[in-house]
């Protein structure tokens, strides 16, 4: 596996997987913060495919539930469209960089990617496990369920997108500090490789990422998807996200993590999710996100 020089940027401006308006503006905020020019300065072939068309938010229906799930029909629509766009990028041998939007969009992106690999690995860089199922979800918010859906459990219509499920043993969770009871049990039952914030404190981010790389190589993965939720970072530094949990990764730690992942040449696709400019300060979180992506694609000081 090698890092491709050809990148497709795909916006997925979904706000339907959670309750706070504004995360649908994430792709625009990230572009406004200079993403395209930042990547082109690295001599990369960058094509912005624009945003997929998403349903209009109906405020009266925004908090309604179907099958115990919020905005279920809208999320199906978003993920079906995103699945097609990401599949097209993979088929054209381009690196899909998907901009959320809330984390429910990972169902569409990762399910598309997994069809093109025999043994895909996933790095879930997040404060949360996103391993809930509807029956156990405290909120009914689908942004807390995408990784469980990708392993083959969840609502039927979303599972239909995913013909090649992700093996739990091919998943690495990094930055965990807020897990629901059912998620903790699922992690234990399936022995999912997990680095909590306590582990990161003990080991340091360098050892965590090096262990992650070696672990996925030992699993003989033929591609690795990086799903980066900005709520993995500490909200005191990175405030523009909707599900904040104190005590997260620092901006500096995250830079180093992405630098190491770049050097590994292991990552074959990426999501960047949960940037919400309406609760940010002067687009600070989007600017941080752009800097992190630049580092991931090889940007250095010297």
UniProtKB/Swiss-Prot annotation:
Cofactor binding note: Binds 2 manganese ions per subunit.
Pathway field: Nitrogen metabolism; urea cycle; L-ornithine and urea from L-arginine: step 1/1
SUPFAM superfamilies: Arginase/deacetylase
PROSITE patterns registered for this protein in UniProt: ARGINASE_1 (PS01053), ARGINASE_2 (PS51409)
Catalytic activity: L-arginine + H2O = urea + L-ornithine
Keywords in alphabetical order: Arginine metabolism, Hydrolase, Manganese, Metal-binding
Record-level Gene Ontology MF annotations: arginase activity; manganese ion binding
Binding-site positions, substrate: 128-132, 139-141, 180, 243, 274
Residues given in the record as Mn(2+) 1 binding sites: 103, 126, 130, 229
Biological-process GO terms, alphabetical: arginine catabolic process to ornithine; urea cycle
Top-rank lineage group of the source organism: Bacteria
Required co-factors: Mn(2+)
Alphabetized CDD domains for the sequence: Arginase
PANTHER family: ARGINASE
Record-stated family: Belongs to the arginase family.
Protein name per UniProt: Arginase
């Amino acid at each position: 596996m090698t890092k491709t020089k050809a990148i497709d940027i795909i916006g997925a401006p979904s706000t339907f997987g959670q309750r706070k308006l504004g995360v649908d503006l994430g792709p625009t905020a990230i572009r406004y913060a200079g993403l395209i020019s930042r990547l082109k300065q690295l001599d990369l072939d960058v094509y912005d495919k624009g945003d997929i068309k998403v349903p209009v938010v109906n405020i009266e229906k925004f908090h309604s539930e179907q099958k115990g799930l919020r905005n279920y029909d809208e999320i199906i629509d978003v993920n079906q469209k995103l699945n097609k766009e990401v599949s097209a990028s993979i088929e054209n041998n381009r690196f899909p960089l998907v901009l959320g939007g809330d984390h429910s969009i990972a169902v569409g992106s990762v399910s598309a990617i997994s069809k093109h690999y025999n043994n895909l690995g996933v790095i879930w860089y997040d404060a949360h496990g996103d391993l809930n199922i509807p029956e156990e979800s405290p909120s009914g918010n689908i942004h807390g369920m995408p990784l469980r859906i990708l392993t083959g459990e969840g609502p039927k219509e979303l599972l239909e997108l995913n013909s090649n499920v992700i093996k739990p043993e091919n998943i690495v969770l990094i930055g965990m500090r807020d897990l629901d009871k059912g998620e903790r049990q699922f992690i234990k039952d399936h022995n999912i490789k997990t680095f909590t914030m306590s582990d990161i404190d003990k080991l340091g981010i360098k050892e965590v990422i090096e262990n992650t790389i070696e672990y996925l190589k030992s699993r003989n993965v033929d591609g690795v998807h990086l799903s980066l939720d900005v709520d993995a970072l500490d909200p005191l530094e990175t405030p523009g996200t909707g599900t904040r949990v104190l005590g997260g990764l620092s901006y500096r730690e995250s830079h180093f993590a992405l630098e190491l992942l770049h050097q590994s040449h292991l990552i074959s696709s990426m999501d960047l999710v949960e940037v919400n400019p309406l609760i940010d300060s002067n687009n600070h979180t989007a600017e941080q996100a752009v800097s992190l992506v630049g580092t991931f694609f090889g940007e250095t000081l010297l």
